Amino acid sequence: METIYTLNADKFLLLLLSGFMIGLSKTGIPGLGLLSATLAAIVLPARVSTGIVLIMLICGDIFAVIYYRRNAVWRYLFRLFPFAFTGIFIGYLLMKKINDEQLRPLIGIIILIMLCLNYLWKKKSNLNIPHRWYFAAILGLIAGITTMMANAAGPIMIIYLLAMNLDKKEFVGTGAWYFFIGNLFKVPFSAKLGLINPDTLQLNLLLLPGIICGAITGILILKKISTRVFNIVVEVLTVMAAIKLII
């Protein structure tokens, strides 16, 4: 397993970049989340990368829930959590059976599927999305499984939140609290799998400045950049990185 003692400078810088992108994704540029998870899976063994990314995500989540702490619509979260937690447990059981060679391409495939979903819902945003309980059940289960195995539930949550017809701040705030609580719920399962341990936490500590810089940068530059162009670039890079994982 890679540790802070065996990582070369290039790999460490790529992980620092991954942390920076996670910070950015939590304060206004969500598309970077998938790219950061994919990049970490390229740099590190696939299983280990999920634990490293999880702690980075939680650090980023803290910034998001502080910034949007009053904007969550809790009734939608309470509807989703039982199914999401069940999905996380299913993902944990699957992770017990999968090795690095199997998980690496699987992460790539999950990322590509999530990107396709994201693209379809952007193109068909006027579709009538169901509000019934089974909608939360299905998306909650899928989000739980994908987040446990690949830290890649973002597009699923976007679909769910779109269906709730929230305003912009409620949309971001509700999503921020979902990911914070969901990611905390994943910690004991990841620790049980050996994906979070003293070595990974030490590495996470060194990556913390990148996350902080990303979160602050996201707040400062969000209104000054073309989000559409930026997201296109991010999605292209994510596709390339996901394909690299698969092949």
PLM region spans:
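Short, strongly hydrophobic alpha-helical membrane anchors
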Residues: M1-L13
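Residues within membrane-spanning alpha-helices of integral membrane proteins
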Residues: F12, L54, G108-I111, L115, ...
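Small-residue-mediated transmembrane helix hinge/kink sites in multi-pass secondary transporters
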Residues: T38, Y92-K96, I159, I219
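Transmembrane helix exit motif
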Residues: F63-R69, L106-H131, I219-L220, M240-I247
